[in-house]
Swiss-Prot record:
InterPro entries: UPF0736. It comes from the Bacteria. This is UPF0736 protein BcerKBAB4_1085. Belongs to the UPF0736 family.
Amino acid sequence: MLYLHDVWVNWFEGEENGYNVCHFYEWRKDDTIELLDQVPLLKVDATLYHYIENELLELPQKLLEDVYHKAYIRKNHERLQQEYCFVVTDGKGIIAIDSIGYNVPIRKSRLIPRQEQMVYEMVENVQAEKYEFQVEEIEKEHHILSPSPFIMNGLTRKERQLKQLLFMALDQLHTTKNPAEIRYWFTEWDPSAYGMVQHMEFEDVWAKLYDEAKTGWSEKHEQLCERLVKGQPFFEKLWEMENEQKVN
């Protein structure tokens, strides 16, 4: 069993999509950084790595047994044993996992670049461990509240957060089934479409707005998001939290 020592982690909890587990350059000052005193390192095949990184499904039982009680976190000068905590790689991607006692990867973190380089060197000539696990035959279904990585590629942490907030607001807008309201919001997005949308059904206008808004991120997206969340306390709070961030 390979081990890493003094590993800095920034846990993202309950993230099924790997793109929301931020790399080191996107970590923020107010993130909670923890220190793993010791953590086992596993090399697995690409299929299992992708499954761990991009799902919140059961980890292989044998893997859990292999890492059981082998990691320690350092807190307030204490060395605390962790149940199921490990770093996993397929030789390309790297992610730290803490199941907090469950059998699914509840908490996920990237590593700092120096420690990533150490992982690559340690596993370079190591065979991948074989673990049996059930892969869903059905392709993972992405939807408005769990967008495809293709929709999020190339965006900063702040842009991803705001885009997901925009999608949450659009999803809520969909529940209203109000034709006049959706036509208003599409005209806000594209003033030149005013005449066209007056003759379209609610579902068609909403689908067109979502289809156009899901590509990229721009000032236009940001303005629509800001206007949509106005007057909705929960959404407004999320908006304010992201806009307090000057970077990322």
